[in-house]
A protein has these predicted regions:
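Generic structural signal for well-ordered alpha-helical scaffold segments
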Residues: 42-49, 127, 131-139, 159
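Acidic, low-complexity terminal tails and accessory targeting/binding regions
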Residues: 1-7, 50-51, 79-83, 90-101, ...
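Short active-site segment of divalent metal-dependent hydrolases/proteases
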Residues: 16, 154-155
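Phosphate-handling substructures
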Residues: 32, 75-132, 194
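Active-site-proximal alpha-helix that buttresses catalytic centers in soluble enzyme cores
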Residues: 6, 11-79
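Short basic (Lys/Arg) and small-residue
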Residues: 151
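Active-site signature of alpha/beta-hydrolase-fold catalytic machinery across serine-
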Residues: 72, 157, 161
Length: 200
């Protein structure tokens, strides 16, 4: 029961102009991390290095903001990283490019964070996608310690799946840019070690 299968440290990509504006996006090629984002990733990389624990593998979403962040981490740890398409952000469909405030005004009768955007991905389907890819990653890295560089929403989904929190409540979990979240996966359960950690 207490035999650990895998330990995953999720790193949220560094700040972007969209993230700072609370703007929904699932574009792969824009926006890049900004100056603040680069600084955040360097700080979290230093935190990882100081812990001195071996990282067996680094994975990343293929989105530009994530691969830029992963490259900084991989260079410092002197490792390569692998992109996985299923680690991309939720497909926001017609909401893509809008801020949370703009959508709240447009759809005042909807729970923007939980509802399914037109031509987009339902929150439960999104969480299942993340659960499925994490199960696949874990099966390939048994007894390993890995890093996944991805989006806040992906990390929220991972936490919800690990702790069996309903998908529609995942927006209540705050994940800061450039932060680390760690989950230990066991045979029949998972443990959230820490969430949204940002080095002082």
């Amino acid at each position: 029961m207490f035999q650990r299968k895998c330990k995953i440290t999720f790193i949220c990509h560094g700040s972007t102009i969209y993230l700072e504006d609370n703007r929904f996006t699932n574009k792969l090629d824009y926006p890049p991390i900004n100056e603040n984002g680069e600084s955040e990733i360097k700080k979290i990389t230093d935190f990882i290095k100081k812990r001195g624990l071996k990282t067996n593998k680094i994975y990343s979403s293929p989105a530009l903001c994530c691969t830029q962040s992963a490259e900084i981490i991989a260079d410092e740890l002197k490792q390569d990283f692998e992109t996985i398409n299923a680690l991309t952000n939720r497909n926001y469909g017609d909401w893509n490019g809008y801020t949370f405030e703009e959508l709240t005004k447009k759809y005042n009768d909807k729970n923007i964070s939980a509802d399914c955007p037109e031509n987009g991905e339902d929150i439960k389907d999104f969480n299942k996608r993340i659960n499925d890819i994490l199960a696949e990653i874990i099966s390939k890295n048994l007894r390993g310690r890995i890093i996944i560089v991805t989006h806040p929403e992906v990390i929220q989904a991972a936490i919800c799946n690990a702790l069996k929190i309903p998908a529609e409540n995942e927006y209540k979990i705050y994940i800061r840019p450039g932060s680390a979240t760690q989950i230990s996966y066991f045979t029949d359960w998972a443990s959230l070690v820490y969430s949204g950690h940002v080095p002082i």
